[in-house]
Amino acid sequence: VSVTLDANVEELQLTRSSAINGTGNQIANVIVGNSAANTINGAGGNDTLTGGAGRDAFVFDTALGPSNIDRITDFSVPSDSIRLDNDVFIGLSAGGLSSQAFRKNTSGNAVDANDRIIYETDTGRVWFDRDGNGSAAKVQFAVLDRNLAITHADFIVF
């Protein structure tokens, strides 16, 4: 079952006990999953996403920028996953995120040229840096809880 919010509708509550694909729209949405393994996509806007129980997947497939940063309120390691569209997250190969492409630290900065996804442990911010420690600016796309035991294995590129 898939549900997509119509334009100008702000909230989506997934009910029942079966897995549902819930997708937002271009404004700031609140999407709350159910007890099943849901796929939740905020689409555009600064969204608040809650998966609920179950092995949830949070999808990021829209243009990155300051008006498109989603807060995941209950990301559970290792049950949940973050899915990244490689048309948006340019330079990432499809499949599981490589360990070399992931960095976790308190600065939120890439340390070497391979770092692409950076989890800032003290704030929960998640960044994409298309050239690692090169000259391109990093872009925030999500906020999770602080100090999670998150690793590269929690990210899937499609």
Report the location of each language-model feature.
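Glycine- and aspartate-rich repeat motifs characteristic of hemolysin/RTX-like Ca2+-binding segments
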Residues: 1-71, 81-82, 125, 136, ...
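Acidic glycine/aspartate-rich repeat arrays in secreted/surface proteins
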Residues: 13, 55-158
